[in-house]
Amino acid sequence: MESLNEYMDKIINRLKAVNEKDELVDEGMRKLQKCQEKIMKTRIDAQKHIDERHEQQSFEQQLLNKNMFETEQLEEKLKRLDDENKIGNEREFNKKLEAISAKWTDDVNLLKTTPNEPNDGNRKKLSNLSNILV
């Protein structure tokens, strides 16, 4: 049988080995805890970045929608103004045409009522043109 001292030395050596391994386990656990903290911090930062990006995209989408709506309104307004301009141009053209026609009719009537003048060729031309207008 072994002596008590040898037996006690073996026990002490084993306790030291267990103690060293316990310290290694504790050190490993501390490292794991630091890794876990880094992972949590990274996740939180990533979530903040995602939230900020989502908020920015939402703002940009609202701005885009607003600009598209304003563009559509301006296009409709431009179309209305273009239509009004065409109508105005047609009215102005019709007024000018009516004024020319009225003056022409007055000139033709004046020539018909005045006695024959020496320039009968012009009178025939006016007569032909008045027949075209009437």
From Swiss-Prot:
Arranged from A to Z, the UniProt key words for this protein are: Cell cycle, Cell division, Centromere, Chromosome, Kinetochore, Mitosis, Nucleus
Where is the protein localized? Nucleus; Chromosome, Centromere, Kinetochore; Chromosome
Q: Which is a GO BP term held by this UniProt record?
A: cell division
Keyword Cell cycle assigned: yes
The signal peptide stretch is none
Q: Name one GO cellular component term.
A: nucleus
Does this entry carry the keyword Cell division? yes
Protein name in the entry: Kinetochore-binding protein 3
Species of provenance: Caenorhabditis elegans
